[in-house]
Amino acid sequence: MASKEIKFGRTAREKMLRGVDILADAVKVTLGPKGRNVIIDKSFGAPRITKDGVSVAKEIELEDKFENMGAQMVREVASKTNDIAGDGTTTATVLAQAIVREGNKAVAAGMNPMDLKRGIDLAVADVVKDLQAKAKKISTSEEVAQVGTISANGDKQVGLDIAEAMQKVGNEGVITVEEAKTAETELEVVEGMQFDRGYLSPYFVTNPEKMIADLEDVFILLHEKKLSNLQSMLPVLEAVVQTGKPLLIIAEDVEGEALATLVVNKLRGGLKIAAVKAPGFGDRRKAMLEDIAILTGGTVISEDLGIKLESVTLDMLGRAKKVSISKENTTIVDGSGAKSDIEGRVAQIKAQIEETTSDYDREKLQERLAKLAGGVAVIRVGGSTEVEVKEKKDRIDDALNATRAAVQEGIVPGGGIALLRSSTKITVKGANDDQEAGINIVRRALQSLVRQIAENAGDEASIVVGKVLDKNEDNYGYNAQTSEFGDMIAMGIVDPLKVVRTALQNAASVASLLITTEAMIAELPKKESAGGGMPGGMGGMGGMDMM
């Protein structure tokens, strides 16, 4: 086992604080509308330019093991906030640094770290209650656009794109952000349910120019097994032919003789038909087939349920106004499933999302939910260079997450004003002087955001804080973009409550742990072994005459 180095008390906390400061100082320059960029060197390709706090934090690794521990703890604050709220990483980092700094001073002055922690926890709970009381629910598209614009560092177009996407696919819909091949940023909305399986044969195509198969007013047969011959399907095929309507087969696979027979019938014009593979794998495939069945009002043909292909009737088939199939995707628009059944399925998937502990499963369940409840919107990010596209994509991702958070829990005045106002509303009392000191640490830390935003904008922080607090109005604050004072919500400067709340709770949680740390253990660097000397020369070659 390698030797360890141990540091105690004040020495340990000073090292840790230095690490916290290095990381936080690099992250906090990005805060606010006039925050600066950070350039990150990459081992290959062009350097990355970003204003995203968590991207900066993730790149920082310090040489000194003890300093690095402090930095990594604060990095954890940024990552956790990003995971839960999707934004607010810089806010969380600035708050954590402020609480650790103030807490360290109090510990150095001889106060009890555990009582300080209790005081911090009491104050944070009080502030969260105050924030929740003054949060404003958002309902209009304009308010959604405002939140998106703020999170994208004042880019109005991004805010409008996100608002439009949310309007079209609903709050439950999936909105993805991709890199475009052009210089323009555009929004594409896929209505209905889309899954990533295309036609099994190009002969099913009805539009040779676009290479897509469009089927209108279509019957949909859902089968969970492979189809290799059509003998057992003949009764239902004949029934569909009688109606004169097209048929889409969704099965695990359609192969060999079955596929050949379908293609021949399609080419002869006797049968308007297309076949695609079912989406997903294993249990997820079964669940997705069930989703499609509920959306289209059909039944999944499954031997588990005792249904055989021979006994399938027309009323077991799903129906949809339109199905569009490309080489890679199938989109079902306007399925004829009962609204109550779809709502029941949506509620069931929401319950599964609440219960699951796996991020991957949660993501897949959310995709299924979106396909049933709304649709899918894709924001394609354009730009002149790869570096510009990546930077813009980072901002749009942040803005999208912030907007979703705002819809969930509502908004509060932005620019750090909500926390600054809450610092004057903390009414909770500590059980002793040390707990009171913990409460005061939070009071002072809550000013740090407005101070940092003002500093980044080149204004005098103390004057800004003083001016804001002089006026006793909840929404009155400081607009760093224009250096003006006024009603923050009227100016469109808002923050999602979920982001502010999560940032504060995570910052206080990690900062409390750092304050109550008394010892740090790190592995000693391995000593390089001294390099071997030069190999000895050749021994004498006795007995030989030299010519």
Curated annotation (Swiss-Prot):
Membrane-spanning segments: none
Keyword Glycoprotein: no
Cross-referenced Pfam families: Cpn60_TCP1 (PF00118)
Record Gene3D superfamilies: GroEL, GroEL-like equatorial domain, TCP-1-like chaperonin intermediate domain
Keyword NADP: no
Recorded GO CC terms: cytoplasm
Catalyzed reactions per annotation: ATP + H2O + a folded polypeptide = ADP + phosphate + an unfolded polypeptide
Compartment(s) of residence: Cytoplasm
InterPro entries in UniProt: Chaperonin_Cpn60_CS, Cpn60/GroEL, Cpn60/GroEL/TCP-1, GroEL-like_apical_dom_sf, GROEL-like_equatorial_sf, TCP-1-like_intermed_sf
Residues the record lists as binding ATP: 30-33, 51, 87-91, 415, 495
MF terms in GO: ATP binding; ATP-dependent protein folding chaperone; isomerase activity; unfolded protein binding
HAMAP family for the chain: CH60
Protein purpose: Together with its co-chaperonin GroES, plays an essential role in assisting protein folding. The GroEL-GroES system forms a nano-cage that allows encapsulation of the non-native substrate proteins and provides a physical environment optimized to promote and accelerate protein folding.
Family according to the record: Belongs to the chaperonin (HSP60) family.
Protein's UniProt name: Chaperonin GroEL
Protein source organism: Rhizobium leguminosarum bv. trifolii (strain WSM2304)
Gene name in the database record: groEL
